Amino acid sequence: MSTPAVTAIVLNYNGHGFVTESVRSLLDQEFRDIEVVVVDNASADGSAEEIEAAFGSRVRLVRAPRNLGFGAGNNLGIRGARGRHIVLLNNDAVAAPEFVGELVKAAEADITIGMVAAKVLQYSERDVIDTTGHLLYPDGLNRGRGRLERDEGQYDRCATALFPSGAAALYTRRMLDDIGLFEESFFLYGDDTELGLRGRLSGWGCALAPRAVAYHHYSRSVGAYSTQKAFYVERNRVLVLFRTFPVSLIVVSPAFTALRLALQAWGALTGRGASGRLAAETSLFHLIGLTIRAYGSALAALPHVLGERWRQRVRRRIGTREFLGLMAEHRLRARDAAFKA
């Protein structure tokens, strides 16, 4: 059996009604040297059986014994992958026919490229951007570049991104062999941030392939403004901070966090941004309690994260000045973090 150029992985959890569209979009790619793998995270809605019935042997179905989360679930697929490039596509995203080919073209343009970001548009409004790579706030929080802007080609001339969204991305085998796979303790959210920053710290570049288009139902699996999402986003941004940021930035990060939380609290009170949407579903006091619980959970995970930071130190190929330069180029502003949905 010949080795494919690309292994495309769809991680599925209870994707009944939409995962088959995602898988079919990969099988219908113009780029044909591809194997498609679906990792099912112990779905309880029959979607794994739906995939089996719809695609048979055209798709390799890997069943996880339980819901492993994003990082561990994708790692299960990556460990069994045969391709020299790994493409990830969320089960609530659909790839345009040129998607994989454009990602591969960008990855193979330069041997230093370890990641490629796609242009991800909203599924329901296909001229509205979901992400063109990520922006980073100085306390570890991230947000999609261009999110909710009308797509007028404003990012098409950007050759690079800081790191890709795991909803639609390519990672080269050579980078993953160098730095390792996703951090499995995150479970949800921030996994792609940690891996992307670890790659950048190790000297790998990230290209943007604006013609690699995917259409995404934003946070369909857990809800765009759910308390579960808010918990993991806040918990895991702390872990990203301690795993990847320079010590000098960790020291000053509480000031940036205080500013962001103050603006988010104002957003919750005035109904603006994601905090306002969350506050409409629950109380401000509940959100404060959720944030405290997130910090407690992050504190419990810190020994593991700091141990991984120590083990990864020998692979760091850029210093604090270069990291700050990347942050300046791809910085998320506090007002945007607080007031944009």
What is each of the regions a protein language model found here?
Residues A64-A81, N91, E102:
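Glycine-rich, basic loop-to-helix element that forms the pyrophosphate-binding segment
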Residues I86:
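Short aromatic/hydrophobic "clamp" motif used to bind/position activated sugar donors
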Residues R24-D33:
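Short, acidic, metal-binding catalytic loop of nucleotide-sugar glycosyltransferases
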Residues V128-I129, P138-R143, E149-R174, T193-E194, ...:
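A recurrent flexible, glycine/aromatic-enriched loop bordering the glycosyltransferase active site
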Residues L162-V213:
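A short, conserved alpha-helix in the catalytic core of glycosyltransferases
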Residues V94-Y137, L141:
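Conserved donor NDP-sugar-binding/catalytic core segment of glycosyltransferases
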Residues N14, L26, N41-G46, A54, ...:
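Conserved short acidic donor-positioning loop in nucleotide-sugar-dependent glycosyltransferases
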Residues S202, C206-G307, R321-L324, E329:
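Active-site-adjacent helix/loop segment of glycosyltransferases
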